[in-house]
Amino acid sequence: MSSSNTRDIESGMEKPREIDDYSSSYEMNFLESNSRTKHANNSVSKWQDFKDSFKQVDLEELDSSLTEAEKIAILTARSPLKRQLKSRHIQMIAIGGAIGTGLFVGSGDSLSSGGPAGLLIGYGISSSFILCMVCALGELAVEFPISGGFTTYCTRFVDESFGFAANLNYALQWLVTLPLEIVAASITVSYWDTPKKYRDAFVALFWLLIVMINFFGVKGFGEAEFIFSICKVACIIGFIICGICLVCGVRGSYIGGKYWHHPYGAFVGDNAGARFKGTMSVFVSAAFAFSGSELVGLAAAETANPRKTMPKASKQVFWRLTLFYMISLTLVGLLVSHTDPRLIGSSSADAAASPFVIALVSHGIKGL
């Protein structure tokens, strides 16, 4: 073969290789520019979605022949909710939704007014009501996953007036609960000897934190609730382990049921009437403590797959009530006397008045 033919063959082999290199580099540049364009478009669309979330939703006019209940159902179904809550969000909302100020601080008032036995009776009966309610709510949320939450069921299955009353009461509840929780959080900071002028600033700080969480939509709420619930569950489990050790006498002295007997007593009061009255007063604190259990039903409207996640979340309520409430309150009644002056109701309301804190501090546990 001549040298000219050899050069032609080699040049013919090099040309496709050059074309391949050029085409591959072109594809890489195209994909890179395309990804940048998509990223920019996604950023613009997210920012536009954020701005549009503050606008009023445009709804077409409804047929005048529809009843008021049918109009309410249609308008509720058209509400722009996004199903972005995952199974782990719902699980932690079900577990940690009702663990808060009512348990950590409010139970101190119940202990001082009802005694350890009255505390368990009041919370035990209330928890049985909550268990039935959440299970029924879970069934409704699975069968009718509507956007309005559980208050819409009152309008749909009972009456419009009953639904209005339920919505009004629920709105009033959160109008009171939100500032109460914010102030309670700022008061908790005072446990670490924070100057009073800074405690007031914490109210604004916690309020801004809540506002910022809501800026991130339902997904941000789910992640925040997931993290906060894990912290609360970890605190309760840690207290239960520590409380069992203290009751069994790890610190040197066996406690057992000392605070259930004379001169302390299982109930508050010198006669049956006073003891009954003290026990009944526990139901008020228990009702407040269990507020938040209904968040599972509200979150069903924004859950990706409510038919799968809601039954699991509803079934976990039993373990939450048993483990996080009844066991922890039993240990509180064994470790703290209802005559302790530090309990809320007999002194100022601060974090030191929490029976959980008193139970640990009184037995030499430091570093809280």
Residue ranges and their predicted role:
Residues 200-261, 291, 314-322:
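Membrane-interface loop-to-helix entry segments
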Residues 108-110, 138-139, 143, 151, ...:
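Helix-loop junctions at the membrane interface of multi-pass solute transporters
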Residues 82, 92, 103-202, 212, ...:
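Extracellular loop-to-transmembrane helix junctions
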Residues 152-154, 159, 191, 266-269, ...:
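TM-loop-TM module centered on a large, flexible mid-protein loop between adjacent transmembrane helices
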Residues 2-108, 112-116, 130-131:
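Membrane-interface "cap" regions at the ends of multi-pass membrane proteins
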Residues 101, 105, 178, 235-236, ...:
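Hydrophobic alpha-helical transmembrane segments in multi-pass membrane proteins
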Residues 91-99, 123-124, 128, 168, ...:
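Residue-level signature of the transmembrane alpha-helical core
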Residues 118, 228-231, 297-333:
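Junctions where cytoplasmic loops transition into the N-terminal start of transmembrane alpha-helices
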